[in-house]
Structure formats: structure tokens, C-alpha cells
A protein has these predicted regions:
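Active-site-proximal specificity loops/subdomain of glycosyltransferases
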Residues: 69-120
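The conserved acidic donor/metal-binding loop of glycosyltransferases
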Residues: 133-137
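Short aromatic/hydrophobic "clamp" motif used to bind/position activated sugar donors
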Residues: 129
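Short beta-strand/loop segment that forms part of the nucleotide-sugar
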Residues: 55-66, 81-85
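Short, acidic, metal-binding catalytic loop of nucleotide-sugar glycosyltransferases
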Residues: 46-56
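Conserved donor-nucleotide/metal-binding helix-loop-beta segment in metal-dependent transferases, i.e.
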Residues: 138-171
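N-proximal low-complexity "stem/linker" segments adjacent to membrane-targeting elements
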Residues: 1-43
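Catalytic core and acceptor-binding pocket of nucleotide-sugar-dependent glycosyltransferases
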Residues: 181-266
Length: 283
């Protein structure tokens, strides 16, 4: 990331913001996962149930139909959604094969599929739904929709130029924010998503899914961001700093211990997969 973006974020985070008044409208929560996410998911769920200030109608887990995932959903009062039912095809059917050069290749079909699920508006019954990464843990109360129905976006200092290059392909006239919407969580409005799908399809003449797939740079490991695309597309919104802390798996503890230790200075914690070890989460 650039030094300029770091400075902009710090200035933004140091500002004093008025308290947000949350909407009373219920929301759904939609979490796409694969089996390896089950170790960290209990902490994510506890954070959602403790810190999302809106009424939650249902929590949906979108995943492969594997016995351990279905059993986890039954044990934790979650609604399981077979990932192949969302679009009528499986992640592997995207065939997103990458060429990194020097004989190195990769398959990002599953990674992109989860992003398309978040953008689909096809899961849940509420107009608004919160998507959150399985390794992200909320430790302070979060408002995602204000009482005048503006979406709240929690801004970060992430900076990855291929995301912005991709957006310029999809929607060339879209003005981009000087901070990042990549925040591990986002509230989606199905009405806004309809407009986004239409705008993407109008630009290309193809379906929004095919347009995104065709726009992906096959030489780039991470060439698309659903959060950057949607956040920049929504016009009526409220922005706040994310105040997040990234931690290695060796720092895992039960939820209350994490909350007591970090909530004085941070609003959320993330335990990235690349910092993962074979550790059982305490719940």
C-alpha cells in the first residue's frame, strides 16, 4: 500500500464521528465457507451475535454439501445452503485458471465463486444481508444500516491496484473512494445489487457473472474485489474506519478473552489463513 493511503486512513481514523442510529429493520447474515473454516467460524458467529446491533432473522452458511459442514450448521442453529443451488453450478464450473508465468498456474474458481455469492442477492429473505469472512471477529457493536437507511461501510487502508483496474473495466465511469472498502464484512442491499447487475450487463451486453469472469486478469492472483466494486457503486452511504487488528493463530483464545484484551483499541479482529496453525479454537 502507498504511504499516502496510510496517511489518509490515519487522518480519517482520528476524526470524531457522531453516534450512528441503527435501523430497526431485520437483516440476514450470509457466510460462504469451506470445510477448513469450521475451526475459526465459532468465534466469527459469536462476534456476529454479540456485536451486530440489528435484529438478525437468519444466519445462512453457503458451502459444499459435506457432512461435517451440515452437522456444524445443525449444531449451531444455522441455515445450510448448498453452494451449487445459488447459481445452478459449482465453483469448479467457473474454470478460472490463472497463469503466473514461469510455468506456475493456479485455480481461483472457488475464491471468485464466494465473491459472486455475496453479490448475488439470492440468499435469504431480507432485503439487507450482512456478509462476513469466517476468519473475522467483531468485538465492538457495529451498525451496518442507519435509521435513514444508509449503508455503513467500514473503510480500510488496503490497496491493490488490480481491483481498481478491474472496476474500470466493468464500470469505466465509476468514481473511486480514496480509501478501501476491503474490510472482511459488508451489508448488501438487494435493490442496490439489482442496479449493479444491470449496470454491469449494460456495459458489456452479457450477464453480470460472465462479465466479471471475462474481466478477470488471468495473470493476477487476486484480480477482483466484490467489496471494492459494491462499496464504490453505492452512492448514499456512511463511512467509518474499520479499526481492525490482524493476529496470528497463536493468539486465538475464547471470545470473551479476545474482547477484553482488544476492544479498548480495536473494533474487530482477523485471523488470516496464511497465519493458520493446527490449533483448536476455544469456545
Amino acid at each position: 500500500m502507498s504511504q499516502l493511503r496510510k496517511i489518509r486512513y490515519r487522518l480519517f481514523a482520528w476524526r470524531s464521528f457522531p453516534k450512528l442510529q441503527p435501523a430497526e429493520e431485520p437483516i440476514d447474515v450470509v457466510i460462504p465457507i469451506i470445510a477448513k473454516d469450521l475451526k475459526i467460524l465459532p468465534l466469527c458467529l459469536e462476534g456476529v451475535r454479540m456485536c451486530v446491533v440489528h435484529p438478525i432473522k437468519q444466519i445462512y452458511i453457503v458451502a459444499p454439501a459435506q457432512p461435517e459442514i451440515i452437522q456444524f450448521c445443525n449444531d449451531h442453529q444455522l441455515q445450510f445452503v448448498d453452494e451449487t443451488s445459488v447459481f445452478g453450478f459449482a465453483p469448479k464450473d467457473l474454470h478460472l485458471q490463472l497463469d503466473y508465468g514461469n510455468g506456475l498456474t493456479g485455480d481461483r474458481s472457488g475464491w471468485l465463486f464466494q465473491q459472486l455469492v455475496k453479490l448475488s442477492g439470492k440468499v435469504g429473505t431480507c432485503r439487507y444481508y450482512l456478509c462476513i469472512d469466517a476468519d473475522h471477529v467483531l468485538i465492538r457493536p457495529h451498525v451496518f444500516l442507519t435509521n435513514d437507511h444508509k449503508t455503513v461501510f467500514y473503510m480500510s487502508y488496503e490497496e491493490h491496484q488490480p481491483y481498481y483496474d478491474n472496476i474500470h473495466q466493468l464500470l469505466p465511469e465509476l468514481k473511486l473512494h480514496h480509501l478501501s472498502y476491503v474490510d472482511h464484512k459488508m451489508l448488501f442491499d438487494k435493490e442496490q445489487l439489482k442496479k449493479l447487475h444491470q449496470a454491469i450487463s449494460k456495459q458489456s451486453g452479457e450477464s453480470w457473472i460472465d462479465t466479471i469472469l471475462n474481466s478477470y486478469n488471468r495473470h493476477c492472483h487476486a484480480g477482483f474485489s466484490e467489496f471494492e466494486l459494491y462499496g464504490n457503486f453505492v452512492m448514499e452511504k456512511v463511512c467509518r474506519p474499520w479499526l481492525q487488528k490482524r493476529l496470528p493463530y497463536k493468539c486465538l483464545a475464547d471470545y470473551e478473552t479476545l474482547r477484553r484484551k482488544w476492544s479498548g483499541s480495536r473494533w474487530s479482529l482477523t485471523f488470516p489463513d496464511y497465519m493458520r496453525q493446527n490449533i483448536t479454537v476455544q469456545v
